[in-house]
From Swiss-Prot:
Coiled coil residues, start to end: none
Entry's transmembrane regions: 3-23, 30-50, 58-78, 95-115, 122-142, 185-205, 216-236, 237-257, 280-300, 303-323, 334-354, 363-383
Swiss-Prot/TrEMBL catalytic activity: K(+)(in) + H(+)(out) = K(+)(out) + H(+)(in)
Membrane topology term: Multi-pass membrane protein
Swiss-Prot/TrEMBL GO biological process terms: cell volume homeostasis
Keyword annotations: Antiport, Cell inner membrane, Cell membrane, Ion transport, Membrane, Potassium, Potassium transport, Transmembrane, Transmembrane helix, Transport
HAMAP family xrefs: NhaP2
Localization per record: Cell inner membrane
Identification of the protein by name: K(+)/H(+) antiporter NhaP2
Length: 577
């Protein structure tokens, strides 16, 4: 390749990435998932599009996609809170194993019938599209305000279900190549190896990487690169040992994000941009790889297969996978069934048969691409609507427009949060002394019209003021309520109830005030309101959990770890309104 060709590639790549970034701003206005925009640009630049670029380098696409997935999952793992694992680990693992098996089997049998394939080839299609995609889930669920149980289950499922899909795909390809029709006992050994090595190397390598970052003094800009290179190394080593590199790099990121780490915010800020670049590159390359004209002949059976997977296979797998977990109500199960988002992983898995030289490899790839496209367009565009219908969205709180870590020491928890006050903030006009700041938080600076003020307790807040607050991460919910908009008060009342009570209040006293019947056993044992609600829920509580008892609807309004702090209450008849 000469210098002119290299420069041409640079120009082409930069133009495609720039177009993807600029057009991404239209995705929210059009209601189209941003990943579809990236995919469409790749298709337009491809052989059947206006770009006319011939691209069929499957090994290169495989390499780029795996590298991008490693970056996305490393970033996603760092942003997953440990509390999410406490709430959703076992349900998510059930969906990642039992759920993927059921989805793959049901989808595979339908694929064999629709495309007139051997059963084992149909099952291969089912395995290829059997797992949800972490890149799609992290991208599309961000900012939706889902309750913690639902959001965490979907995120952890997407980060941990790829080992099963990868293993099924590789196993079925080997069986087709060797003309086998039955499974051997090695099936179980391989799947244990995938999960076992993924967990062991991910956590072990993540711990070593954490110690390296905290013990070695480097310029601030090198810590993100060290974390990135370490994460990719863990991904590559695990994959080379026939373990799940995807699971390993996700757990590595989770460990880094939930332990004290040097320059944490610098790493996260850099990872945010790198994750976006990885998504753009991955979907552009996968879009270039497909030939749209090849999708037309299979459009009808592929659409029927997509509908079968979305409306039959995924719901059945979710209800079966969540059967042992009574903490999920029917609405939450239905919503999780709907969010079976497919993305880059099925397309990457569809490259495996191409590289193995199977007879129907091109068909497998086109079907997988079509299923992903339908999933993103149908499920991706309707996520917000489905979340509201299923009532799994909790009222939002105000988040800072900027947050910067005070990286004095890896163990230092303090950060600076920046809030800008709009006209709709309830605290406008209030004196600083009247703000009920969380304990140990301080207003470090107040800017008005780009001028730094020296505020006193009598200083009143005005529209447009910018406050810099020193606090810790667990102070964000309280600060968010303090600097929230006025209208959400009514929204809070509709969602949580007319009154929000302290969970430490005795249930007997609350029952007497409201004139409630029932709950004698709770009164006799002098249980608190929070204890009663947790006992009725029967699972680790999350904000937004509701239970109807004694003619009232009790809603978890605030919690810390697994303990309920505030409970909303309203009359049960209001539920129908």
């Amino acid at each position: 390749m000469d210098a002119a060709a290299v420069i041409s590639l640079f120009i082409l790549g930069s133009v495609l990435v720039t177009c993807s970034i600029l057009l991404s701003s239209f995705s929210s206005r059009l209601g189209i998932p941003i990943l579809v925009i990236f995919l469409a640009i790749g298709m337009l630049a491809g052989i059947d599009g206006i770009g006319g670029i011939p691209f069929d380098n499957y090994p290169f696409a495989y390499m780029v996609s795996n590298l991008a997935l490693a970056v996305i999952l490393l970033d996603g793992g760092m942003r997953t809170q440990a509390s999410s694992f406490r709430v959703a680990l076992w349900p998510a693992l059930s969906l990642a194993t039992v759920g993927v098996l059921i989805t793959s089997a049901l989808t595979g049998m339908m694929a064999a019938w629709l495309f007139k394939l051997d059963l084992i080839e149909g099952l291969l299609i089912g395995a290829i599209v059997g797992s949800t995609d972490a890149a799609a889930v992290f991208s599309l669920l961000g900012g939706k305000g889902l309750n913690e149980r639902v959001g965490s289950t979907l995120e952890i499922e997407s980060g941990s279900n790829d080992p099963m899909a990868v293993f099924l795909t590789i196993t079925l390809i080997e069986m087709i190549q060797q003309h086998q029709t039955g499974l051997s006992w090695m099936f179980a050994v391989h799947i244990i190896q995938q999960f076992g090595l993924g967990i062991a190397i991910g956590l072990g390598g993540g711990y070593l990487l954490l110690q390296m970052i905290n013990r070695i003094v480097l310029p601030a800009g090198l810590y993100p690169l060290l974390a990135l290179s370490g994460g990719i190394m863990i991904f590559a080593v695990t994959t080379s040992l026939d373990g799940s590199g995807i699971l390993a790099v996700y757990l590595c990121g989770f460990l880094l994000g939930n332990r004290p780490i040097r320059n944490r915010h610098g790493i996260l800020q850099n990872f945010d941009g790198l994750a976006w670049l990885a998504q753009i590159a991955m979907f552009l390359v996968l879009g270039l790889l497909v030939t749209p004209s090849d999708l037309l002949p299979i459009a009808i059976p592929a659409l029927l297969l997509s509908m079968w997977m979305i409306f039959i296979a995924r719901p059945l797998s979710v209800f079966a996978g969540l059967l042992p977990f009574r903490g999920f109500n029917l609405r939450e199960r239905v919503f999780i069934s709907w969010v079976g988002l497919r993305g880059a992983v099925p397309i990457i898995l569809a490259v495996f048969p191409m590289m193995a030289g199977l007879d129907n490899a091109r068909l497998f790839f086109n079907v997988a691409f079509f299923v992903v496209l339908v999933s993103l367009l149908l499920q991706g565009t309707s996520l917000s609507w489905a979340a509201k219908k299923a009532k799994v969205v909790v009222p939002p709180i105000s988040w800072p427009i900027s947050r910067v870590g005070l990286d004095i020491h890896p163990e230092n928890p303090w950060e600076q949060f920046v809030y800008q006050l709009g006209a709709d903030k309830w605290c406008i006009g209030a004196a600083l002394r009247d703000l009920h700041m969380p304990p140990e938080t301080r207003i470090a600076a107040l800017f008005r019209n780009n001028v730094l003020l020296h505020p006193t307790g009598s200083t009143r807040l005005r529209e447009g003021d910018i406050l810099c607050v020193i606090g810790r991460e667990h102070d964000l919910p309280a600060l968010g309520k303090m600097f929230s908009q006025s209208p959400p008060v009514a929204l809070d009342q509709r969602f949580f109830g007319d009154f929000i009570l302290d969970a430490e209040a005795r249930f007997a006293d609350v029952a007497q005030i409201y004139g409630l019947d029932g709950g004698e056993e709770f009164r006799e044992h002098q249980q608190s309101l929070g204890e009663v609600v947790q006992q009725l829920l029967g699972a680790a509580p999350v904000v937004g959990d509701q239970v109807e008892f004694a003619g009232m609807v009790w809603t978890v309004a605030e919690k810390e770890n697994d303990h309920v702090l505030k409970v909303g209450v309203r009359v049960a008849e209001d539920e129908a309104e």
